[in-house]
Amino acid sequence: MSGQEDWESEIDNPPACVPNLSNSEPAFKASNQNYFSSNNAFNRTTERGFGNRKASDDCNQNFEFSERGFGKQRAGSDANQNFESSERGFGNRRGKGRGGFGTFGKDSNGKQESGDFTNDDNRTIDDNRRRGGFQRRGGFNDETSGRGRRGVRGGTSFSGFGREDGNEQSGFTSNDGFNNETSGFGSGRRGSRGDSSFSGDRESDRGRGFGRGGFRGRNEDIGVESGKGQEGFERSEQGPRVTYIPPPPPAEESDIFKHYQTGINFDKYDDIVVEVSGSDVPPAILTFEEANLCDSLAKNVCKSGYVKLTPIQKHSIPIIVAGRDLMACAQTGSGKTAAFLLPILAHLMVKGVESSAFQTLKEPEAIIVAPTRELINQIYLDARKFSYGTCVRPVVIYGGTQMFHSLKQISEGCNILCATPGRLLDVIRKEKIGLTKLRYLVLDEADRMLDMGFREDIENLLKSSGMPSKEERQTLMFSATFPSSIQSLAREILKPDYLFVVVGQVGGACSDVEQMVIEVDEFGKKDKLMEILQEIGSERTMVFVKTKKKADFIATFLCQEKVPSTSIHGDREQKERETALRDFRTGQCPVIVATSVAARGLDIENVSYVINFDIPDDIDEYVHRIGRTGRCGNTGRAISFFDKRGDDEQRIARSLVKVLSDAHQEVPAWLEEVAFSAHGSSAYNPRSNKFASTDDRKRGDSRGDYSTSGFSPSAAQAEEEDWG
């Protein structure tokens, strides 16, 4: 055809003359590096580039680098192509790369295309796997969806605004963020350090924290093992970085020492039976004067409204002052926090503190660990109250808050460190605190930490560098329940001659709580809850449910029914959790719906009712839940919904009957029938094997001379009754 272009002929017969570009210079020359190497080597590292990668191994390709050039392509045969890429330029990539704003590249098999529409092995471009990026030497097309075709001189750089994976995905970079193998914008091997910083949609490529990369080069590490950068930002694996800074604690003295009055039943504590087992037991004290507190501490105790010692305080304070390890078990709301804080503070104030704000490495003398953020913050407020106006500085750190804030608090001086296990291990790994001067290690709610997911954290804490051995430190463990299995674990932490204090009925519910069990099926619980709340009115009520989703659902349902409510559970952000507790404490929301996160140790003023919307399958959890009311001699009521067909109800039935009987509460006849039918079934977990009523060392394991104080044989016999 004369005068017309023969496209078929041009495609089948490539031009005989190929321009020689070997003498071309790059756009920006920033180093003396040889741009045209002939040794067919692959340079696998880039520094701060916009995504330079090696070519596919299918052909003998040669990548050459300039430090700041834009890079360009050299001419050559299909089987031996040479590429230049820039270490700081708009990187050149191989087929499966995830690099920069593409200049001349390759297709997914490492073969260069020789025409607009076909490559050398005569496959159409639509058959190739496509990536997003600036392609065809300037056009922007998403090849994944088949839009656009590659240009004559190479393919795309497989990045820019796109993702790899062979399907269309969005995002500015292809590998989930700005950083990958060599940081810069995009680029890098999958699985390299700091896999993703500003994560996109792909779960498999998500990294933790800022990682290595982001806005820095390969060797400029700003990430740490637990996903928290040195700048103090925490990042979850799927969420944004944590920037929440909790509000400062109250500064006014009247707010610091604000307290609620003890109830009319507080004097009944004098009648509670106490057992202390072990050798050489220090005698109990009866008044605060006998504790020999320094003047400043004694004044703060008085300002806090403490007039009379509780049973756990009478026995624990002299034991701790004597330097003995202690495992103390007392019912909820009986003053366990003051029982370990007062002797620790008294010792630090008399002997003097060693940690100073002027030291680079802060070394606290006491570390207090609790399983929940709310509980550890409460312990801190008590420590701050008792140490007010003294040389002792308590600090609290916990997850869900900005790491930088935690480190800042520590840097200002730290004598008593209150922490949750995870955040404590983080600051130890960062070497922000030292442990060589540690005198006291306190585990509050110790049974939960050893038995419910925190055991590994506690073991890692005890193995931390600088941690004194158990012979060199004083270890104190407190809880409302100490099952036998936990006692066996605790003996690995405590000295062999530790003392065991039992107050009242171990694992039993507080006698100041009126307990009621109501038979109701699953579908009638909401109506029954509304009926009870309408009768209660504006009295402060905690509603416990089993799942996080149900907590939000019930709270929303109550709000729709014009009952001001809020919720608290582990999936809520720390700011939301603290706001919920504040609204509940102030009475803005008289009803709070919670999971077990709020069942441990929280001391909220004037909680009149606890409602178990979902009864727990573990009797320990039941005891802790109802212990949110009836505290410090105040009376309270606990109402539990019981669905006889529920699995959890079957598991707890017989243990629940015993708890009710021990607390002199009425046991419904139908509940006794359920408990009897559950006897011997797989759903029944015998309470006698779960609860420890006395020191396990007394059960045939005689490793010392054990004495008892205030011990009632008849009471112990009842507690040890075998329900199995």
Curated annotation (Swiss-Prot):
Ranges of Polar residues composition bias in the record: 168-182, 683-692, 705-715
Motif (Q motif): 286-314
Domain (Helicase ATP-binding): residue spans on this chain: 317-500
Leader sequence segment: none
Chain positions recorded as ATP binding sites: A330, Q331, T332, G333, S334, G335, K336, T337
Catalytic activity reported: ATP + H2O = ADP + phosphate + H(+)
SMART domains, sorted: DEXDc (SM00487), HELICc (SM00490)
UniProt feature, compositional bias: Basic and acidic residues: 108-130, 693-704
Major place of residence: cytoplasm
Biased composition (Acidic residues): 1-11
Molecular function GO labels: ATP binding; ATP hydrolysis activity; nucleic acid binding; RNA helicase activity
Helicase C-terminal domain mapped to chain residues: 512-675
GO cellular component, as recorded: pi-body; piP-body
Domain of life the protein comes from: Eukaryota
Keywords associated with the record: ATP-binding, Cytoplasm, Developmental protein, Differentiation, Helicase, Hydrolase, Meiosis, Nucleotide-binding, Oogenesis, Repeat, RNA-mediated gene silencing, Spermatogenesis
Biological role stated in the UniProt entry: Probable ATP-dependent RNA helicase required during spermatogenesis to repress transposable elements and preventing their mobilization, which is essential for the germline integrity. Acts via the piRNA metabolic process, which mediates the repression of transposable elements during meiosis by forming complexes composed of piRNAs and Piwi proteins and governs the methylation and subsequent repression of transposons. Involved in the secondary piRNAs metabolic process, the production of piRNAs in fetal male germ cells through a ping-pong amplification cycle.
Protein family: Belongs to the DEAD box helicase family. DDX4/VASA subfamily.
Name the record gives this protein: Probable ATP-dependent RNA helicase DDX4
Species the sequence originates in: Pelophylax lessonae
Lineage: Eukaryota, Metazoa, Chordata, Craniata, Vertebrata
Gene expressing this chain: ddx4
